[in-house]
Structure formats: structure tokens, C-alpha cells
Amino acid sequence: MLWGLVVPMILYAARMVEILARPDIPFDSLYTYLPLARQLLEDFSKMFSQPESYKVAPGAVIYMALAGADPVAVKTANLAISLAALALTFDTARRIGGRVAAVAAGWLYALPHMLVEAGATLMGESPFVFLVALWLWATSCAAQARTGRRAAAVQTATVVLAGLALTCATLTRATYMYWLPFAAIVCLALATRMQGPARSAALRIAAIHVIAAALVGAYIVRQNETFGRPMVATGSGAALYFGTNPVLSGYEPPFFGLAHDESTVSDGLGHLSLEGDRRLMEVAKTMLRELPAKALMKMYVRKLGAVLFFSRAHLDRHVLNDRAWRVVLVLLSILGLWGARRHAMGWVVGGAAAYQCAVHVPVMYNPRYSISALDVLLVLLAAQGIAWIWSRQRRHAAAACCVAFLGAGIALGSYHQRHSRALLADFHQIPAVAIAVAADKDLHAQGWDSNPFDAAARMTTNTATVDWTPEQPLPQDMITMVHLGMTRFEGQCRRVWLTQRKEGATRSTSISLEGLRQGQDINWGIHHVQLPEGGKSWHVQLRFECSPGTLMQFEGMGLYQASAGRYFRQKALAPKE
């Protein structure tokens, strides 16, 4: 108990302090969650009848309202429920796989950075993770066979608690909404083929999901009666719209230096308004119909890899980064699935993990969604994997093989991060619209043995620059990209710096080019380098950092927009507007 739970809890709390001490408040909490929580405190009866209430799932708002809508109080509550989630995960692992699994779960929860960040950040992740941990713990209690006079009462209580926890988790983040009926039906179907304690456990797990499905369904019916739409909250339209955008590989736009372009569809209504959400959903459905199946599947495979192992778009370059921890958790989870295959909870946790992967692939990629959805589940499964290794007769040999296997996985993940295809916007599926095209006389290339705009040229040193200085300032927008066409490329580049200068003011951003391939253009948003409008002078520079001798040939430079909303809007909305 001391080394398996108490010490990990102390370590976890100590690691949370730095994040809890940050004075900044995330955008969504500052402008959505906290204001709604204050409205809830002012007038509870009217809050859920106002249009603002459908913009987010109610769980996070109620949680922050219970803390007085005070950021310090919410962070304090985050610390408390995060430690409780760790303890619940510890005991759930013990009930499934014994003491070794419990100790492993405690350390696997506390050591990686992901759940520390999710638990401490002032957002909806912390209550969601806690409620998922509570649901899994109560379900593990309900799945256990009990004897004695109070057995029926205890099992009934844990079934009800698990159902309520799963309901609250779904109303905090609605990702489990489709899981509820699916799991209930599967458990009922399996129960018809089972006998004895296994059948009873399957029926109790089915009852948990029936309770949650009924309560969440009642809330959805209430939303339909109040606002005319069956939903937990809006936001699914934007999530699918950005997640299907082939220009950005389904990633959130800031990963490419862009702002969100939902206004091209919502016309200022807001992506969380009923009409804005409907429009974005229609455009997303049109994209799914129009995009080639091969391109869509290729994007989904890449996103599945990002959901499981994170993306190079936000990973640091250390070998033991978040991807390394995910590799460890996923590989150990595979062993854990095998080790817990005869326990009902092994199927519940494994099924939930597979489901969460599936529902997060089509929607907008952001690592915090993956962390809150998967990490508790993976910790539980990975703990079972360690317990399974420990139970082998030749445990030391099994452990050595496992360590070697994990090391190889980490090395492969690190290699992929450094050498996979560079993450740049792609104009192949959606034609880009030119905002301004650079004239030849306004372009100046330096650092190559000849002009790369005329013919293929090699870099003479490890840096080279392309400067664009138009005669007049050019129009800019937060969804505009700098485009540098590249028809030839051979060699290796580390990064390119995008810099904008205007009358003495300068802003720049670094773009990773590791893994740049022949056929890729340099496309990057100017949102992070925008300067105030006005003035006469305007200058854009791309400064490459590549190996000497790298061969490049360019084909024009300019400002372009490749908005999926503008391109698909007419097909999706014209008959309905």
C-alpha cells in the first residue's frame, strides 16, 4: 500500500503543483465554462433553459459551479479528485489482477506526464477522468461474485453507483454516448450464452449501461423538447468538420499556424450555436461523401496513429517523451488484454479503449482529447500486462523480453517522429485560392549556388533564405497561408523560420521540416506571425536550416487560402439556405 499507492499519490500531487500554480486560464474555461458556472449559481432554474446551456455538456459547468466558479477553488478540487481517481484506478486494477497489478497501476498513473496535465488543467478533463475511474471501479465491484446476506444489496448499490458515474461522465464529455446502448446489448447477448457467476456479472454490467443509457437518453429528450434537437451539447459539427479537413490532415488548425475557419460556414453565428453546428455538420458530411475513399482512409490511419501515439506536431524531441509513455502503455495493454481475457472487466476496459479510439479518429485531433479518453483505460490494461508477466514461471526472462520489446517500440516511435513525412498543409484535395502571388522581381533567394526559382539549386551552407518584399502591403487573414511551391527536393532539412517584418516590428515562428519529401510544398499559416495592419513596408522571409548540398527548386510564392468550408459550402448548404 505504501509504495504502490501512497508514494505514487505524493509524487503525482507534487508534479501537479507547477501546473496548478500557473495563473493563466484556458480559453474555453475563461469564456465558456466559468461564465456558465456563474450563471448557474445565479439562477439554477433558468440556466438550462437558456441557449447558452446547450453549448457545452453540463457536467463540467456543474462541477465548476460546485466549486463556486472560482479558479483557485476549481484547481483545488482538481487536485482532490485527481488523487481520488488514482486511488480508484489502483483498487480497480487490484480487483482485476491482484496486488502486482494495483502497484503497477499506481505508478503508471503517476509517472507519465499526460494524466498529471489532464488532472491539473482548469478544464473539463479532470472531472471526466475522475468519473470514468469511478465508473470502472464501481463496475469492477459489481462484477465480483459475492456471498452472504448483504451480497445482493452491495451488488445493487455498486450497479447503481456505476450507472450514475457513467451517466455523469457522458454528460461531462459525451464521447461515451454511443457506447452505452452498444455495451448494454453486447453484455445482454453474451449473458444468454453464459452460465453461473459469469452470466450474473454480464447481466450486472448490462444493467449499469442500461441505467446510464436511460438517464442520458432522458437528458437528450429534454434537450430536444427545449431546443428542438436531440443532443447532449453542440460541438459535434465543428469536431467532425475540422476532423475531416484533408488540407490539415484532420488536425486542429493552430498546429499549422492557422486560426479556426468555422466562420466560413457559420457566418458569425458561432460554431456552438444550433444553426452553426448544423451547417458545420452538413459540410462535414459533404466532405465525407466527396473525398476519395483512399485519401480518407489514409488520413484516418494517420490519425489513428496520432490518437494512440500522439503526433509530431506537438511532441518534444526527447526520446522519453509522451509518445514513449504511450508506446509503453499500449504495448503493455496488449499483454494485459490477454492476461485479463477471462475477467469480465478485461473485456469492458478493452472494449471501451477500442471504442474511444474509433470515435476519436473522425473528429478533430488534439492530444488532450486522446489523453482524457484513453489514459485511464490504458493504465488499467497495462497494469494487467505487468501482472501477467509477473505471474509467469520464468518471470525474469519474461520481464527481460518485455523490456527489450518496449525499448524497441520506443526507438521505433522516436525514429518515426524524426523521419516520417513532414506535417505541412496539403492542397491536393482542396484547391487553394490565391490571395496574392509574388512577382519575380519581389523575390530574392540567397544561400544556393544558383537561383532556385529558375532551376534546381543546392544550398552552399546550412542556411538559406527566400525574401518576399512587395511594393505594397498585402491583405492578411488568420486563415491565410504562405505558400512556397517546391518541384524538386533532395536532402535533409531540420526547420524553416517564417518571419514577417513591418516597419520595425518582427514576428517569427519555427516550422519543422524533418522528413520533408519530394512533392511537398511549404504551406504554413500566418496567424502566429501577423502584425497590425497599416504602414507601407511589408516583408516575409523563409529561412531554411538544412544540410549543405540540399537540392531545391521552387515554383512561385504567395498567400493562399484553402478553406474546406468555402470549398464545400455551396454543395452542402445551397439547397437549404
Where are these regions (language model features)?
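Transmembrane-helix signature of polytopic, membrane-embedded enzymes
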Residues: 3-4, 86-111, 129-130, 150-152, ...
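Membrane-interface anchor segments at the N-terminal boundary of transmembrane helices
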Residues: 72-73, 286-349
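Membrane-proximal stem/loop segments at transmembrane-domain junctions that anchor or position
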Residues: 227, 231-303
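Membrane-interface alpha helices of multi-pass inner-membrane proteins
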Residues: 105-106, 110, 155-173, 214-217, ...
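Transmembrane-helix motifs of polytopic, lipid-linked glycan transferases
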Residues: 76-97, 134, 138, 331-335
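Start-transfer (signal-anchor) and selected internal transmembrane alpha helices
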Residues: 1-17, 188-193, 197-212
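Extracytoplasmic catalytic/substrate-binding loops of multi-pass membrane glycan-assembly enzymes
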Residues: 21-36, 45-63, 69-72, 229-234, ...
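Multi-pass, polyprenyl lipid-linked donor-dependent membrane glycosyltransferases
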Residues: 27-28, 51, 55, 59-60, ...
